[in-house]
């Protein structure tokens, strides 16, 4: 087990500054690096630190960052989710890592969960300087996930999303939707999502629980599954059989599209279980084994 340090890292991305934690293991050789960020509307302190620590103890450098508009990263309005901007933040962090002389830039790994798992799949299909990716319960097909909404909910969500988008064009304050809600309209409307999402929230950090609604329209059109055939690096893909947010068939189809480069797992858990207890331990051990096989150890 390696000791490590954690250093604050601030990187310019567009007109904003991205805040990150840089986990640096104490090793004789330059370590491989894992770049990590969270899913929809989540901060890096929402259960991702436990992953970063375990990777660093295993000898891997880790860059764990918050998107613009979130956490200590800059940008307004606060808590805005922009798929385009968040993908650009990923590209910025990768470009920054390529310039650091203290790590092995030939061994860059992307790690994503839920929505950021979709980002990792997109980037693996797009970029040539990524050596492997690891995704858990990834968001792969917004068109299919949109079918989770009832016929009463979907038009309402689209209406609020459109109102927020048009209002932003003329400088109006954002119209927001809850990320989760037990009874009302929200981004994650399934029965287990309310308790599941709140189980990862860190009460030591500000989180309003609502985000500007404009992203809803983009989410239901976001389909990383379409780019999966262009991936030619090793992929660890962990799906959950009881996932109420990510249709199982969409995960299976995505994995089929990535073959033969994918190591695919289906576990009998719900979407948010992977951050806790036995499922976290199983996930981290599986991920470390994958890294050992495809990236090596220090």
Label for each model-derived stretch:
Residues 14, 44, 70-105, 277-283:
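Catalytic nucleophile-loop/oxyanion-hole region of alpha/beta-hydrolase
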Residues 267-298:
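Catalytic active-site module of serine/aspartate enzymes centered on a nucleophile-bearing elbow/loop
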Residues 244-250:
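Conserved alpha/beta-hydrolase "acid-adjacent" motif
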Residues 121-203:
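Alpha/beta-hydrolase-fold enzymes
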Residues 231, 237-239, 243:
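Short beta-strand/loop motif that positions the catalytic acidic residue
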Residues 40-53, 67, 249:
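The serine-hydrolase catalytic nucleophile loop
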């Amino acid at each position: 087990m390696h000791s490590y340090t954690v250093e604050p890292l601030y990187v310019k991305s567009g007109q904003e500054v991205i805040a990150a934690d840089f986990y640096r293991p104490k090793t004789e050789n330059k370590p491989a690096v894992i770049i990590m960020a969270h899913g929809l509307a989540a901060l890096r302190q929402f259960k991702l630190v436990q992953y970063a620590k375990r990777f660093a103890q295993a000898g891997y450098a880790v860059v764990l960052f918050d998107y613009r508009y979130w956490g200590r990263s800059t940008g307004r309005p606060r808590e805005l989710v922009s798929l385009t901007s968040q993908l650009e933040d990923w590209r910025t962090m990768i470009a920054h890592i390529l310039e650091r002389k203290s790590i092995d830039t030939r061994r860059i790994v992307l790690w994503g969960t839920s929505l950021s798992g979709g980002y990792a799949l997109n980037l693996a299909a797009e970029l040539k300087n990524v050596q492997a990716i690891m995704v858990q319960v990834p968001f792969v097909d917004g068109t299919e996930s949109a079918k989770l909404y009832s016929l009463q909910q979907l038009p309402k969500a689209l209406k609020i999303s459109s109102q927020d988008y048009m209002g932003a064009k003329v400088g109006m304050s954002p119209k927001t939707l809850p990320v989760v809600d037990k009874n009302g309209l929200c981004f994650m409307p399934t029965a287990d999502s309310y308790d599941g999402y709140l189980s990862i929230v860190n009460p030591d950090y500000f989180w309003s629980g609502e985000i500007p609604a404009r992203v809803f329209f983009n989410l239901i059109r976001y389909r990383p599954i379409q780019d999966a055939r262009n991936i030619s690096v090793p992929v660890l893909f962990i799906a959950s059989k009881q996932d109420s947010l990510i249709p199982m068939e969409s995960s299976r189809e995505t994995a089929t599209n990535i073959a033969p480069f994918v190591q695919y797992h289906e576990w009998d858990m719900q979407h948010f279980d992977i951050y806790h207890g036995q499922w976290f331990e199983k996930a981290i051990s599986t991920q470390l084994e994958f890294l050992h096989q495809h990236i090596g150890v220090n």
